[in-house]
Amino acid sequence: MSDESRSTPTGGAGLGRRAVVLGGAGALGSVLLASRATFGQQAKRPTVVRAAGAGPVKSVHLAGTDGWVSMPAGSPPDLPFYPDSLAPPGFDTYVFGFRDVTSMTTAQEVAAVRGKAQISAPMLAFDEGDEVTITLSNLGLLMRPDLFDGHTLHWHGFVNAIPLFDGVPELSLAVPIGRDLSYYYRPHDAGTYMYHCHFEDVEHVQMGMTGMVFVRPAQNGTRVGSVPTGARLTYAYNDGDGSTRYDREFAFMLTELWSAAHYRDAHIQVSDWTDYAPSFWLLNGRGYPDTVAPNGDPRSTAGGRLQYQPISSLITCNVGETVLLRLSNLGYQNHALTLDNVDMQVVAKDASLLRGRDGSNNYLSTNTVDVGPGESRDVLVTPRVEGEFLLYDRSYAYLGNGGGPGWGGMMTVLRVGPAGTYGPQTEPNT
């Protein structure tokens, strides 16, 4: 854990390792509503953003705004905070968030996303050595036109960053309403990272401006160690021995939601963050049982009340396959995740392979993984029997929805089928 770690909502948190060294130059964008650059088309992909560009040059365009989402049906009222009386039909909670607008080619299309934020933010995935440009547009807040909050993009854990691109507004730039800023990155270290807005970060992170980013290792596609012929050549890290090889991957952004703070932001009130008392505990922006609902698309109304919470946390695999679980915590509480009846092997912490100075693997076999605020873990599981297994927070206090009866909160399901039940995975969380 780095010196920026936090256990209370009083500021930013660090991932605690040397990760990506930023270089090159980025450029300020034009006025958003005056002109709009053309970006590459994006195939429909509800989980991980497919960046535009061929080869090692990748471009992504994100927009920051506000919107409405839904907590699990049947959650008891906590008036006046939940459900929010200003929420449109089908929704109950006010949020801030990011949207992927990479495929949009006109200013009008991008502007139409205002007031339609999603949580958690789009997952981003890049390869080692990619030249990455992420353009952030600030669309403003539809519900709060009185606010002129800027937004930034902070790649959590990328140390030694050029301040201009680090996203900490005190040391760099914030994107004002109606403007763009392009961030430039060249990732050199594989691992599981996260990103968030660092402008008024205690508020903006709690309100939903959090997402995950993966850097895939250069070792991918290469047979190393004792990896058998025919096995999928995907790895979590450049391990050199194949010990982090996996068949499927699923990512989880761990957060909490304090209904009172979300209500106050919608109703022009101020929160005292020392009173922090979450009402809901979420995986990828959803509480159980919504966590096991299918992936959605924020552009489609078919998702109903989960339209703007499009990322599923359901884990599926065939018996005997190895599954990579990417865990990131941008909440303000510690979370200890337990997987019933399936051993877990922790191979990395904070985007750093667990390896000793002598080169030996220091992986940890366990049934519970602790993830502190601002931290990440990479975990491998290989189920040996068919069935359904629960992955959940070990603190039962975090397994409810707004204090209501029954199970809820930070819980999902690992569903293991016979060989051949699930075809090859093409995207994370599918």
What role is predicted for each listed range?
Residues 121-122, 238-240, 311-314, 323-326, ...:
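Generic recognition of flexible, low-complexity loop/linker segments
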Residues 139-154, 158-162, 166-227, 361-430:
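Extracellular/periplasmic metallocenter environments
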Residues 330-333, 338-362, 395-399, 409-416:
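Active/binding-pocket-proximal capping segment
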Residues 319-326, 332-336:
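Beta-propeller domains
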Residues 227-261, 428-430:
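Compositionally biased low-complexity segments at domain edges in trafficked proteins
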Residues 24-26, 32, 190, 206, ...:
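Active-site-proximal structural scaffolding
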Residues 62-67, 137, 186, 198, ...:
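Structured loops at beta-to-helix junctions and adjacent beta-edge loops in soluble globular domains
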Residues 2-6, 11-155, 159-165, 169-174, ...:
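N-terminal, post-signal-peptide metal-ligating segments of extracellular/periplasmic oxidoreductases
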